[in-house]
Amino acid sequence: NPKLKVGMVGAHVAVDSYQSMKVGSAVDWVAGNEFDFTVKEVADGLPYENIDGLAWRRSNGEIVRNKSRAILENMDALPHVVDVYKRDLTIEDYFIGYLPHPYLSVYTGRGCKSRCTFCLWPQTIGGHVYRTRSVEHVVSEMAKAQQYFPQVREFFFDDDTFTDNLPRAVEIAKGLGKLGIKW
């Protein structure tokens, strides 16, 4: 279907968007680094040339790299992902062997101030500043998650460094305790 557009996100295309586009003509665009709002703008139908953080292919095959998208500072600007899960996913279809099934994965922050040489995420997507959602934003999402998915056996915070801000982690734990979520 020539009207179907194919896009890619992730660590590899964040590091080398041009080469990722160059290897084949099947990919129409790639979104680098934090791609949330870049992909939303693609889905909203904005012209590719107006979307920060996007590399894309013109109809003549030329690859264009737009300016980078700024790192998201206000993490509370992101919508609750559990609303998307409820709308689009059957969570029982997803399995990770080391987590009780079914589980639900949520990010409460991004980035990491450390500079570990073995870790690719801060270098490719999240950056070296740990930016977090507010305690209230996280706890309100977890309350929704309990309501939407009572069958969940484990909530998994997939942050790079959840305990980097220990007082915040303690406040989230207290909020989860008030919801009856075992910590």
Descriptions of predicted regions:
Residues 48-51, 57-105:
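N-terminal [4Fe-4S]-dependent radical SAM core
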Residues 80-183:
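Radical SAM [4Fe-4S] cluster-binding motif and immediate context
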Residues 1-74:
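Glycine-rich beta-alpha loop elements in corrinoid/cobalamin-binding modules
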